[in-house]
A protein has these predicted regions:
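Chalcogenol-based redox active-site neighborhoods
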Residues: 1-193
Length: 193
């Protein structure tokens, strides 16, 4: 992995086709929320299958916490669709059969010349694609548990949401004064001018 892809760095804003064939950027998919990004070997790998099954089971909690999930795989379009369906994922999968991400990040898994995959990584990104945490998943035990992801996402969310602690000084006064700009969701309502 490139040395700049570390906590505090910015992850590249790749533009790749999703499982429907639509080209999407990571920043578009992330919006202003935290994001879990998996860089996957592909559908053929049982370790990927297991990790993504666990993420799919965790996904309802991820969704209610205003967090995004994206998987980038070297699979072609059809195989990518099968991968996504086989694990019951309802988040965006991006296809990179040209291995743009693999080459740019320097994560070719050279021990598998048959498939030429990426070394698997899971990243937790703060808004703006800012790297909070990087997990190297070449070995399965290097991949994060849902408990570790929960802790990482708690850290990121507490840093980016001014209304994380409603008892914080000034929040109640701002709310009572009609200033909802510090309150997630309320800050985007049309009546918050």
């Amino acid at each position: 992995m490139r040395s700049d892809i570390a906590p505090g760095g910015t992850f590249p804003d790749y533009a790749l086709p999703d499982h429907t064939g639509t080209v999407r950027t990571l920043s578009e998919l992330q919006g202003r929320d935290p994001m879990i990004l998996t860089l996957a070997r592909g559908h053929y790998c049982p370790k990927e299958h297991q990790q993504h099954l666990e993420l799919a089971a965790f996904q309802p909690k991820i969704a209610v916490a205003y967090t995004q999930v994206v998987t980038i795989s070297t699979d072609d379009h059809h195989t990518l669709q099968e991968f996504r369906a086989s694990v019951g994922a309802n988040w965006t999968f991006l296809s990179d059969p040209e291995r743009i991400v693999q080459r740019d990040l320097g994560i070719q898994e050279y021990t598998d010349p048959d498939h030429d995959p990426m070394i698997p990584h899971t990243l937790v990104l703060a808004p703006g694609l800012m790297v909070h945490r990087v997990y190297n998943g070449y070995w399965f035990w290097g991949r994060p548990t849902t408990g570790e992801l929960w802790r990482d996402l708690r850290d990121v969310t507490s840093q980016i949401r001014p209304d994380w602690d409603l008892a914080a000084p000034g929040l109640r006064a701002a709310w009572d004064a009609g200033d909802h700009s510090l309150f997630h969701g309320w800050d985007r309502r049309p009546d918050n001018d």
